[in-house]
Structure formats: C-alpha cells, structure tokens
C-alpha cells in the first residue's frame, strides 16, 4: 500500500463531520512536524484550523506555496443506503469508498506525502511550503479559512501561490482545474400588501399580483455578458412563499429568496442597485436583506497555472482546462492575500453522495502532480 493511500484511509476513518475535525489535523501535524514545519492551531467557535509553514533557504524572501484544504466532510445521509460503512475505508472494484474520499481527504494526503517526498529530494529547497487546513468548509465557513486569512493579514503575511485541493476533475482525472470562482450573493425580499377576504379584492392589496411584473423583469434581465474567463452573471429564485394556506384569504406579504452567481464583470453594489431600481420602478413596498457569501476571484494564466498544467500533462498526458464553473470554495478567502489561487483535485462525480469514492489508481498521480508543482516553483 502506498503512503498516500494509507494516509487517505487514516483520514477517512475519522468521522470528521463538519465542524468536528476528529483530530485529523493532529495526524497531519505529526507528519509535518517531522519535516520541520512550524505550526499553529487557530480555534474559533468549535472549528479547528491549522497553519503550518516550512521555510526554505531563502527565508521570507523566497516564494511561498500553500496547500489549502478541509478535513471536515458533509453528513453521511441514511447509513442503510451505503454499501459499506462511510467511515470504514473500503476497497471495491478498484475504488476506495468512504465519506471524504474524494472531497477531500485524498487531496490532503497527497499534499502531505508530496511534501515529504519533495523535502527528502530537495532538503535545501529555496521556497517555503505552507498548509492551511480547516474543519469549516462544508459548513457556514465563518470560522474556518477566513479566520486564518484574517490572522495572516494582521501579521502582514502573504502567499505567492496556493493550490486548493477541491475535486475539480470532471470526466477524467486531470481534465480540469479551477482558476477562479464566481461570487455568490443572496437576497431575501418581502413584498408588502394588505391581507383581506379573497371575495373583496378592492379592500385588500395582493402582494403576489404586485410582485409578478417585477419578478418577470428580474428573470428576463441580462446582468452582464461575462468575460473571457466567466459566463454571464445569473439570477435565480430559490424560494417563493405567500399566503396562509387558506383559499379565501388574500395574503399580506410575499416572500422571495434569490441568488446571484456573478462574475468579475459585475459588482455587489451594481447588482444591488439594479435590483432596487426594478423593484422601485414597479412601485413596490418592500424590505430587502442582502447576504454576500463570496466575491468572485480569478487567477489569470501565470506561474502557478502553467506549473500545474505542465505537472498534469507530464503525469497524465492530458491538456487540462482552466474553468471557473461550479459553486464557491475557500479560494474566495485566500484570494485576499494570494494573487495566484488554483484548485485541483480528483474526480467530483461522487462527492456529497451515498457511496462517495475515489479511484485508487488516481491517488498516486494526484500526489505526483502536487509534488511536480513544488519542484517547479520552489525547489
């Protein structure tokens, strides 16, 4: 059994359902400390975060490459639907099954073993290796990576490169990396009306009828055209609720929850202003609360993307694709202190599902890609 596979299994065996780390990070610290990493644990509201650093011979003047990831996993769902226990690593048909196998304990194991091999081969490496690991990526993400980034900002520390181990591969291992992510902003809209008997509409004010034209305009609006890296911004309704459940009562208010996934072609302020302008144009009386869960970030082609593309090509023979599709990730926080943030990891087809798994044959190549990037950028 390879060292990467063994460590992956050790991590899967720890039932680290968010935000409980289940001492996964303690296991990582033992391995990293043996390599000479300095480390600190940053705890916040039940969340465990790890920042570990091994300086190269160039000291603080050298380039810093960070590996970022999360030890927490999503809940298992109904246990009876799993073919094998989710926290008992199980091999079947060339696959390793277990919650977190693909998202993202294999990536973390790959980070660690790649660093071990790199340090053994390059004991006098010039640049710095760092690890940023959290147990709050699958949850609210309010006490995890963002807290470490804030602490680093206060100390004036920065990263030059960061690889986030998210499972980005789509159809084949290595076929896709993420060099950016769209921003996410949600709105909770309450349109006010006047409740009344449905037989006497002249004595009431139906908020659903008032809302409908504005809603149609919001749905039809083209928010931007996207750009070279991002598709156009999207606006989607997630929930609509109104009424008491009775068939003879005009409701007093209508509630709508919606979400923007927006590119670097738009801004938070600009999108909010346009929504308010449409609602105001239709003469609505309303309350609107906004929640921005992440700003868009983008890493243009550069040293990190080139090194990762070459590493993937050398390891798999594939020409990888740069993409910004998908949901948000902790890369949105890291981008505040790092100009080059790229996500790369295993196939994502089974993540968050019953019987999550990773192809055993992909585990060593994953580690090798990470090691090849270290060799190119900080040896």
From Swiss-Prot:
Organism: Paraburkholderia phytofirmans (strain DSM 17436 / LMG 22146 / PsJN) (Burkholderia phytofirmans)
Pfam family, one: Peptidase_M20
UniProt subunit comment: Homodimer.
TM region(s), chain numbering: none
Entry keyword Ion transport: no
Similarity-based family: Belongs to the peptidase M20A family. DapE subfamily.
Cofactor: Zn(2+); Co(2+)
Protein name: Succinyl-diaminopimelate desuccinylase
Highest classification ranks of the organism: Bacteria, Pseudomonadati, Pseudomonadota, Betaproteobacteria, Burkholderiales
PANTHER family: ACETYLORNITHINE DEACETYLASE, N-ACETYL-L-CITRULLINE DEACETYLASE
Residues annotated for Zn(2+) 2 binding in this entry: 103, 138, 352
InterPro entries: ArgE/DapE_CS, Bact_exopeptidase_dim_dom, DapE_proteobac, Peptidase_M20, Peptidase_M20_dimer, Peptidase_M20A
GO biological process, one term: diaminopimelate biosynthetic process
């Amino acid at each position: 059994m390879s060292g990467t596979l063994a460590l992956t299994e050790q991590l899967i065996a720890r039932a680290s359902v968010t935000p409980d780390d289940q001492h996964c990070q303690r296991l990582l610290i033992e391995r990293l400390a043996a390599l000479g990493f300095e480390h600190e644990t940053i705890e916040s509201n039940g969340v465990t975060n790890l920042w570990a650093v091994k300086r190269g011979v160039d000291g603080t003047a050298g380039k810093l490459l960070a590996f970022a990831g999360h030890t927490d996993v999503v809940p298992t769902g109904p246990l009876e639907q799993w073919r094998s226990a989710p926290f008992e690593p199980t091999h079947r048909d060339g696959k390793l099954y277990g919650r977190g196998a693909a998202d993202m304990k294999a990536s973390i194991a790959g980070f660690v073993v790649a660093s071990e091999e790199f340090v053994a081969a390059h004991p006098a490496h010039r640049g710095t290796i760092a690890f940023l690991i959290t147990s709050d990526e699958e949850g609210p993400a309010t006490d995890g990576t963002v807290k470490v980034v804030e602490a680093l900002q206060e100390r004036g520390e920065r990263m030059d490169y960061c690889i986030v181990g998210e499972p980005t591969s789509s159809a084949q291992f290595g076929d896709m990396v993420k060099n950016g992510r769209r921003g996410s902003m949600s709105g909770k809209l309450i349109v006010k009306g006047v409740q009344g008997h449905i037989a006497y509409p002249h004595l009431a004010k139906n908020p659903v009828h008032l809302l409908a034209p504005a809603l149609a305009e919001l749905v039809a609006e083209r928010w931007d055209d996207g750009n070279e890296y991002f598709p156009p911004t999207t606006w989607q309704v997630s929930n609509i609720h109104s009424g008491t459940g009775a068939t003879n009562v005009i409701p007093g208010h209508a509630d709508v929850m919606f979400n923007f996934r927006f590119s670097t072609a738009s801004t938070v302020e600009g999108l909010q202003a346009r929504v308010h302008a449409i609602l105001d144009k239709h003469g609505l009386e309303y309350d609107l609360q906004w929640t921005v869960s992440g700003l868009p970030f983008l890493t243009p082609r550069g040293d990190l993307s080139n090194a990762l593309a070459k590493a993937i090509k050398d390891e798999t023979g594939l020409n990888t694709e740069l993409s910004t599709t998908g949901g948000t990730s902790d890369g949105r926080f890291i981008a505040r202190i790092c100009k080059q943030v790229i996500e790369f990891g295993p196939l994502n087809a089974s993540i968050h599902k019953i019987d999550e798994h990773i192809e055993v044959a992909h585990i060593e190549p994953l580690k090798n890609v990470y090691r090849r990037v270290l060799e190119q950028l900080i040896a």
